[in-house]
């Protein structure tokens, strides 16, 4: 499934990690139930709630045609207490 693009690490998302909330960018065509099912299946966790919002589109001009570059939205996934998503990469020594 190509629903989740990548995890987001901003000041806000790092602060939300303490509340057991994980932030990631997902494709705009994916639904909440698809993302919830995929996260529960792939990571083996229970999702408590999901919030999503679209980021403001950035314009890009190619000659005379104006287009947009943002084709995703941001999901904040709250897990039930006792569950956590392991880090995707281990630190190399």
Curated annotation (Swiss-Prot):
Binds to 23S rRNA. PROSITE patterns: RIBOSOMAL_L23. InterPro entries: Nucleotide-bd_a/b_plait_sf (IPR012677), Ribosomal_uL23-like (IPR013025), Ribosomal_uL23/eL15/eS24_sf (IPR012678), Ribosomal_uL23_CS (IPR001014). This is Large ribosomal subunit protein uL23cz/uL23cy. GO terms for biological process: translation. One of its GO terms (cellular component) is chloroplast. Belongs to the universal ribosomal protein uL23 family. Part of the 50S ribosomal subunit. GO terms for molecular function: mRNA binding; rRNA binding; structural constituent of ribosome. Keywords: Chloroplast, Plastid, Ribonucleoprotein, Ribosomal protein, RNA-binding, rRNA-binding. Its main location: plastid. It comes from the Eukaryota. PANTHER family: 60S RIBOSOMAL PROTEIN L23A (PTHR11620). It is found in: Plastid, Chloroplast.
